[in-house]
Amino acid sequence: MRAAASASAAVETVNGGRRRVGRGERGTVRTKVRATVTTGRGMRVVRAGAKIDFEDAGLFELPYAPVAETLLPKGPWKVVEGGVCAAKGFKVAAHKAGLRATGTRADCALVLADEDAKSAGIFTTNVMCAAPVTVCKDQLAGKPTARALLINAGQANAATGDAGMADAKETAAELSKSLGVPEEDILLMSTGVIGKRMKMDKYMPGISVLAENVESSVAAANAAATAICTTDLVRKTVAIELEIGGKTVRMGGMAKGSGMIHPNMATMLGVVTCDAAVSSDVWRDITSRAGSASFNQISVDGDTSTNDSLVCFASGEAGNAEIVDANGAEAKLLEDALTAVCMGLAKAIAWDGEGATCLIECNVSGAGDDEDARVIARSVICSSLAKAAIFGHDPNWGRLACAAGYAAPVKSRFSQDNLKLSLGPHQLMNEGQPLDFDAVAASRYLKEVTDVHGVCVVDISVGDGPGAGQAWGCDLSYKYVEINAEYTT
């Protein structure tokens, strides 16, 4: 499942600096929003009963990450349009309620299943988890299905105490009333500034607007993927189609994240919709494994957020016989597809890391088992020294070897005499011995990768064991410090 060595990309100017964005679906949209009111600050507010135009450039325009073109693993599926609306049985909406401190972009989204959908989730390991995370975990522990997911950007509703929990429950109650579905069928996600109460006077009216505007269009799916972003410079969405049990199954996803990204869920939100018929137990098991192989294998800056959440829905509307055998071929195929979608989105988050000029992919083989290999790969992509060296086009393989060596915990430590290490096409170490290599050519490889915001590939073998794993990160630039010195988290 290795990404290409570089990504074809366009270049745009962002905040005075050059930033690469994926070529393809650009979100260049031009339409009108009807039934708006202009406030004293010039902010357009859509009132209840109004029709939202999901192709309004002012609200929903954001470049597209090259998930389908470069980052999605290959498999027996094809890419289709539609994002989270590609699967049968789902509608979405997006809206600007006014929750962001600055900017004109929409800031809330709704994903709605036509009927009860099998639901599974994985969440942050941070003990300071946000109120919406607690609500989600409680809801999913109580029943295997859900109908709606309400997401907001701009305010995290984390470290807000009892009042924050009350706000979360109030938003769920408002959506329940607007949709006519039970509160226990509603899930919540939030992302944004930590430690401040939600702007309930703005959010609550926006909830009914969302409920009135759900649709299953490509434009709505792209609008939702844009609305949930914070410091992201690109929206992250993808959809695929494959055959399971003689039926066409579709799966789509969207994610947000650019900073505060670290293994064991990071400030990332992910949503996947699927129309396969699958038992709750199987769906939860494969969601857990797919998340472990993808979102838990990325890091931008080593900070694990309070709000990290991945929620996956399965509507069952594809018409296939329900998948109940966890060890069967159909369950394996469904898991492969879900893992691919999650990997594509997770890699897009690392690709879009704050200030990044490239994605770093570390592939580890020869470990005692897959988990050991993943631990080693994570250690390498988390190394600030290695990340800085790659940004500086310095083929400093010692930093890579060092990071592999201190990886912990692993069940079986590897011998340095077995270490093999390559940077792109350049082999730097074999069986623990440094090799003569063309440092100028290796530096040129790094420059070529960063010039196109491509993929820097690090291959490591630690022995002859059966374990293999991957992790993804990004380089560490001056821009990362600038962004986070100026942005309140």
Predicted regions and their residues:
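Intrinsic-disorder/low-complexity loop/linker signature
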Residues: 16, 41-43, 246
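A structural signal for small-residue-enriched, beta-sheet-centric alpha/beta enzyme cores
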Residues: 49-170, 176-489
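N-terminal mitochondrial targeting presequences
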Residues: 1-7, 33-67
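N-terminal chloroplast transit peptides
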Residues: 1-31
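A detector of low-complexity, intrinsically disordered, Ser/Thr/Gly/Pro/Ala-rich segments
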Residues: 11, 26-29, 34-37, 41, ...
